[in-house]
């Protein structure tokens, strides 16, 4: 006879979950509160590929970036320093994002930003890598840990023109690889 294990029931999340992506908001790096309802009708490798994707569809695609310091503490700068670091260090070379960057936020754990609570509820795992949570447990710097947690920087979510979460992509998927799905969603938009 083996010992039986009982799993503790997951704690109820105290984060209010929005009914629609367009009910959400966040604060930009410039300190302005952005109501996501302004993106209604639009479809949302990194920084340079995100710029390229945004440039290809300037009127109908909206790229939103949310810096986070939960993955190996790689974003340890302040909100005020982020744009300067992007311009001069990473990726550098005078880089300026042509998409909206929001203030740093938590994407996992008890203080998960409502945007990510909503997205993870509707898309609990990346479509291209549904079984991996994280390859380096020593970098788990949040609690509670959930199966739907974002695994690393540059995990991406594509939201349709009516605000419905469409697909979630692992960090291994380059933004350029999202283009067929972006085109598919743009065809649905009227």
Spans of features found by a protein language model:
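N-terminal "domain-start" segment that seeds a small globular fold
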Residues: 5-37, 125-126
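Alpha-helical solenoid scaffolds in eukaryotic macromolecular assemblies
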Residues: 26, 31, 36, 41, ...
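Conserved helix-turn-beta segment immediately C-terminal to the redox Cys motif
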Residues: 40-66, 87-92
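A short acidic/small-residue loop/turn micro-motif
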Residues: 41, 171-175, 180, 186
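Extracytoplasmic/secreted proteins, especially bacterial periplasmic and envelope-associated proteins
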Residues: 49-52, 77, 81, 110-114, ...
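Thiol-based oxidoreductase modules, predominantly thioredoxin-like and allied folds used
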Residues: 58-79, 94-109
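Thiol/selenol-based redox catalytic cores and closely related redox-interacting motifs
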Residues: 88-173
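Short, hydrophobic alpha-helical segments
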Residues: 123, 185-190
């Amino acid at each position: 006879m083996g010992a039986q294990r009982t799993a503790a029931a997951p704690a109820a999340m105290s984060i209010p979950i929005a009914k629609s992506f367009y009910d959400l908001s966040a604060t930009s790096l410039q300190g302005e509160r952005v109501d996501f309802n302004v993106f209604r009708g639009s479809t949302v490798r990194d920084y340079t590929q995100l710029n390229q994707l945004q440039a290809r569809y300037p009127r109908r695609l909206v790229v939103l970036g949310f810096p986070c310091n939960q993955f190996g503490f790689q974003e340890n700068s302040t909100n005020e320093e982020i744009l300067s670091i992007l311009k001069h260090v990473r990726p550098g070379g005078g880089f300026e994002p042509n998409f909206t960057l929001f203030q740093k936020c938590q994407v996992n754990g008890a203080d998960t930003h409502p945007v990510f609570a909503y997205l993870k509820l509707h898309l609990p795992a990346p479509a291209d890598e549904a079984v991996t949570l994280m390859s380096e447990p020593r970098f788990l710097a949040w609690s509670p840990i959930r199966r739907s947690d974002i695994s690393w920087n540059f995990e991406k979510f594509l939201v349709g023109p009516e605000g419905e979460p469409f697909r979630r992509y692992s960090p291994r998927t380059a933004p350029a690889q999202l283009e067929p799905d972006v085109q598919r969603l743009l065809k649905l938009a009227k």
